[in-house]
Amino acid sequence: MALTLEALAARFGGEIVGDGRCEVGALAPLDQAGPRQLAFLANPKYLAQVETTGAGAVLIAPGDLEKLGAAAHGRNFIVTPNPYAYFARVAQMFIDLAAPPRAAGVHPSATIDPAAQVAASAVIGPHVTVEAGAVIGERAQLDANVFVGRGTRIGDDSHLYPNVAIYHGCTLGPRAIVHSGAVIGSDGFGFAPDFVGEGDARTGAWVKIPQVGGVKVGPDVEIGANTTIDRGAMADTVIDECVKIDNLVQIGHNCRIGAYTVIAGCAGIAGSTTIGKHCMIGGAVGIAGHVTLGDYVIVTAKSGVSKSLPKAGIYTSAFPAVEHGDWNRSAALVRNLDKLRDRIKALETALVAREGDAGGA
């Protein structure tokens, strides 16, 4: 389905420069777009591609349009302060228009406990299990093999992709999106040591601590594939509104993730950690337990966080990749830092002594 630039501007805002009757029916990169496709410029370093693109129209920021000057003549634009966000909204609209509607109802192979409540407008796919006391909200969609435990609530307009497991006593707010393989509400990693003796004579066991809290997920949260969020030991693990979590992320028990925070893939967050609002956690970041990150904290990829970071800012502890030989030389220097320190101290001591002798003379 194609829409005019006028129709897009009426829905999403922005100023049209050029022919508002130009129709676009899809999105494409600047260097690949055709005359019935809409492209966007989010990074000024690609400004030259706007001059050569075959796109029917381009989403562009006001300052970048000014830089084009005469090269903008004869082209069509929607001018907006944030072309990237505009692109995202248009893309979602095109997906919604193209998606075949799913008929409400329960697939015959699904298992719904009589004590569960499933909205008449919900879509329940094949082999879904919904246990007693669970509540499935209006227009929620549960794809094949989803499991919803007892007493769990799934908010209106939420979408659980195939093979998602939501354990008992959890809450998902409205418009939640949970991708395949995610597990929400599994037991937190809680064990009490009960050992006596030392060495080979040591006996005892790790005693499992029952995890009796739940997981509370706020509205408009998206959780990536194969991500796991543990239930709290006593209180709930909390994911606040509009948090976006990538694939393969581990969030330990009793954590609290503040609103609008984003967490990239393979990050691991140990239990009882609090992350503030509008934070950005890079890929493969490791965060120790019982620490607090303040609002607007950014932790770059592969960094390790071992203490609280209360102040907003960018934090890095990862070592960027270098050529193998350079790494070996650096590693050798690191191994000998203690010796270098001792030599410097000895030289400083000798220098002070020499200066003292010279002064006395």
Swiss-Prot record:
Keywords tagged on the record: Acyltransferase, Lipid A biosynthesis, Lipid biosynthesis, Lipid metabolism, Repeat, Transferase
Reaction(s) this enzyme catalyzes, per UniProt: a UDP-3-O-[(3R)-3-hydroxyacyl]-alpha-D-glucosamine + a (3R)-hydroxyacyl-[ACP] = a UDP-2-N,3-O-bis[(3R)-3-hydroxyacyl]-alpha-D-glucosamine + holo-[ACP] + H(+)
Gene designation per UniProt: lpxD
EC number of this enzyme: 2.3.1.191
Pathway participation: Bacterial outer membrane biogenesis; LPS lipid A biosynthesis
Residues annotated as signal peptide: none
Biological process annotations from GO: lipid A biosynthetic process
Known function: Catalyzes the N-acylation of UDP-3-O-acylglucosamine using 3-hydroxyacyl-ACP as the acyl donor. Is involved in the biosynthesis of lipid A, a phosphorylated glycolipid that anchors the lipopolysaccharide to the outer membrane of the cell.
Protein name from the UniProt record: UDP-3-O-acylglucosamine N-acyltransferase
GO cellular component, one term: membrane
Oligomer status and interactors: Homotrimer.
Entry-linked InterPro entries: Hexapep (IPR001451), Hexapep_transf_CS (IPR018357), LpxD (IPR007691), Trimer_LpxA-like_sf (IPR011004), UDP_GlcNAc_AcTrfase_non-rep (IPR020573)
Active site, renumbered: H253
